[in-house]
Structures are given as C-alpha cells and as structure tokens.
A protein has these predicted regions:
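Catalytic cores of nucleic-acid endonucleases
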Residues: 124-132, 146-196
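Exposed, interaction-prone assembly regions rather than primary DNA-binding/catalytic cores
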Residues: 53-150
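Hydrophobic, Leu/Ile/Phe/Ala-enriched alpha-helical segments that form helix-helix packing faces
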Residues: 8-15, 75-83, 165-178
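Long, contiguous juxta-domain segments that are non-catalytic but functionally important
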Residues: 7, 16, 118-121
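Accessory beta->alpha helical hairpin/"wing" motif in late/C-terminal subdomains of nucleic-acid enzymes
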Residues: 8-11, 18-50
Length: 197
C-alpha cells in the first residue's frame, strides 16, 4: 500500500492525476497532460478511450455512475492481472459494427460492455443489463459481472437478453466454428463470497 500511495502522490504532483471528491466518494481522473502523453506515445491503444464523444470523457457526478466506473476499473485490473487482453490493439475486433470474420479467438480477451454495445442497433435490448463486459477464451464465452462490496441487483430479463445476444452474435454469426450453444456462461466478481449466499 505504501508504494501505491507514493506512486499516486507522484502522479498528482506531476499534474498527471487529479483527485475528485463528491458525495464522500473519492476517485482519480487523468489530467490533460496525462491524456496527451498517452495519446502521443500510444495512439492506437488509447485513442478509442480518450478521443471523441466517449463515456470516459464525460464527467460522472452521480454516485451510481461513479460506482459503476469503479466496478469496471476493478474488472479491468482483475483481467489484466490474469493476463487477459484488454486493449483494442491486442485483441480481435469481434464486436466491430461492420462484423467479424478473422477467425477464432486464440487468447483470452475482455470486451467491456461499451465495446459490445458498439455493434449498434441489436444492443439496445441490453441497455439495462448489469454486465461489465464479456470474457472470450478459446473454449468459452463468459458474461462478466462485478458486484464489488454490494449484493447484485439482478434484472433477470435483461441478463437473459445479454445471454441471448452473445449466443446469437458469437455462436451463430461471428464465431460459429468456435462456440456452441452451451458456450455462454457467466463470471461474477465481488469483494467476498459472503454476498453469494
């Protein structure tokens, strides 16, 4: 913890990271200098997240939306620690709006709910789902949720629509040779197993 605190302190002193407080909830945001440095050095990796009218550029002040971003960040860190591909330049563009036909997924890759929704009109039916993204491996499709420290508030119909969409798009259209109907499963991340009972 001490090392992490010193890194965050250094980033704040350098003007690369800003602390944001609201409703007794602390968060960190990239400063303009940090965004510019990322875009200058790795445009293919960070441009999809830091340019245009993206969710990451809009300030989230409502506590519910900020907590969702925290859960998504926890999910990203978990996937990164597991060696799963996160960035668009290191994984197949399975959910591209124009379709996908580049072959099987060979390495585990995580696609955020926002990346999935980039497919277009078909994804309007999953707007109210609680999923944070989809983990694709060579052998399965895992719709991923993160309850963090709270009990998950399930919307059964919404979650079944996500499963149906993954089955339709991946098993029947884009990756038909790789996945069958039983391939769509789920992964729930959380702070402890106590919330699962």
């Amino acid at each position: 913890p001490y090392y992490l605190e010193s890194v965050v302190t250094d980033l704040k002193k350098s003007g690369l990271l800003r602390t944001y407080y609201r409703d007794k909830l602390r968060g960190y945001r990239l400063g303009v200098r940090a965004k510019n440095r990322l875009l200058d050095n790795w445009p293919e990796r960070f441009a999809p997240y830091l340019t245009g009218d993206t969710d990451t550029n809009r300030l989230k002040s409502e506590i519910g939306r900020r907590l969702r971003l925290h859960r998504l960040a926890e999910t990203y860190v978990t996937m990164d620690n597991a060696g799963v591909g996160l960035f668009q330049d290191e994984k197949p563009k399975v959910f591209a709006p124009q379709g996908y036909s580049d072959g099987a997924v060979k390495y585990p890759s995580f696609y955020s709910s926002r990346e999935v929704k980039e497919m277009g009109v078909d994804t309007t039916q999953i707007r109210s789902s609680r999923f944070t993204g989809v983990l694709l491996t060579s052998g399965g499709i895992y719709v991923t949720y993160n309850s963090s420290a709270a009990l998950m508030k399930w919307r059964y119909k919404s979650e079944m629509r996500v499963k149906a969409l993954m089955w339709s798009v991946l098993c029947q259209q884009r990756l038909t040779g790789q996945y069958n109907a039983d391939a769509v499963q789920g992964v729930i991340l959380g702070e402890s197993m106590e919330l699962a009972y």
